């Protein structure tokens, strides 16, 4: 990917290489002018995510019968993607009707195909999300809902590292310490939280649980970072059109999961409606709403804010699971919540003051190259100006001594 710099004297265009991971200029402008409306949107996003993310493990737990699922978890994920696709299509139709005179329609075949090519990167997070959504059900076989949410908070640390490597995001020293404190808080909650004397897949429960935890933390972290990267790199594209591509890829991957399940377990397992109840219908709607809300986080806010809002949802999940299912809130859980809240306060209150938009950081090499070009242009301007304002008999004399 490259850009051009035009000389103001000779109008020659010079190719300037840009960082491959650069965020779009449209998002750069958007982020540099954050208004009170944007802050209100962040509060609304966090509040909605706290409720939806807090309900998710509760609903999954309610769907279990005798400690097992009567339905295929992949079928829930597939129906969730279909629900989100329907929502995206409805919003696109509404948005298309509100186009002003002179605005380019985005539902034409040529525009749609061009947008599909530009947003092909969304297939990467869609694949990771398909794997992660299945892992959410598997994790419920090892931990209670409150513990699942605490384990999910480990994603913040992994996401921070991925953001620094992939999107060149900058963090202050205190922010890194806050993330380390978050890891300590989660570890406190895990002390003596695993059941003893049981096993699964032929492995001791601790080994199996920690193996799933590794995937449960890494896969969604990769999905979130690549989702933010894909959405912001095409910031001018309608978010509902981007969601349509993302959910379309997700539906394809989950359908492949259903086919693989049918091959392994037999054709009878291909019935996507088998074993579902009212609880699973609520779960599908909740997962769809949570996925739609997440896309607004990734495009208009950032991944770290999304994960910290999920951390706040831990309190809601812990209290709700204690009230509904009689799970005990141990002293470890209370201490862990306290540490996590302190960590979140430290992280949000110690951001880099002179932080510039990530796109400017990622295009630092291009700006440096442009500064060198501007020096040449300024020298050319000064010489041209001097030549223009020469008067008298010597106006045809050379600018430089012979």
Curated annotation (Swiss-Prot):
Q: So what does this one do?
A: Sugar transporter involved in the transport of CMP-sialic acid from the cytoplasm into the Golgi. May transport important nucleotide sugars such as CMP-Kdo (2-keto-3-deoxy-D-manno-octulosonic acid) in physiological conditions.
The record's SUPFAM superfamilies line, in alphabetical order, gives: Multidrug resistance efflux transporter EmrE
- Could you tell me where this protein is found in the cell? Golgi apparatus membrane
InterPro entries in UniProt = Nuc_sug_transpt (IPR007271)
**From what superkingdom does this record's organism come?**
Eukaryota
Q: Membrane-spanning residues where?
A: 43-63, 74-94, 119-139, 147-167, 171-191, 203-223, 244-264, 281-301, 322-342
For molecular function, the Gene Ontology terms on record are: pyrimidine nucleotide-sugar transmembrane transporter activity; transmembrane transporter activity
Record's protein name:
CMP-sialic acid transporter 3
Is Transmembrane helix tagged as a keyword?
yes
Q: How does it sit in the membrane?
A: Multi-pass membrane protein
Task: Answer yes or no on keyword rRNA processing.
Answer: no
Q: What species was this sequence derived from?
A: Oryza sativa subsp. japonica
Gene name as annotated: CSTLP3
Question: What Gene Ontology terms describe where this protein resides (cellular component)?
Answer: Golgi membrane
Q: Which residues lie on this side of the membrane: Lumenal?
A: 64-73, 140-146, 192-202, 265-280, 343-402
Assigned protein family: Belongs to the nucleotide-sugar transporter family. CMP-Sialate:CMP antiporter (TC 2.A.7.12) subfamily.
The entry's keywords: Golgi apparatus, Membrane, Sugar transport, Transmembrane, Transmembrane helix, Transport
Q: Please cite one Gene Ontology biological process associated with this protein.
A: transmembrane transport
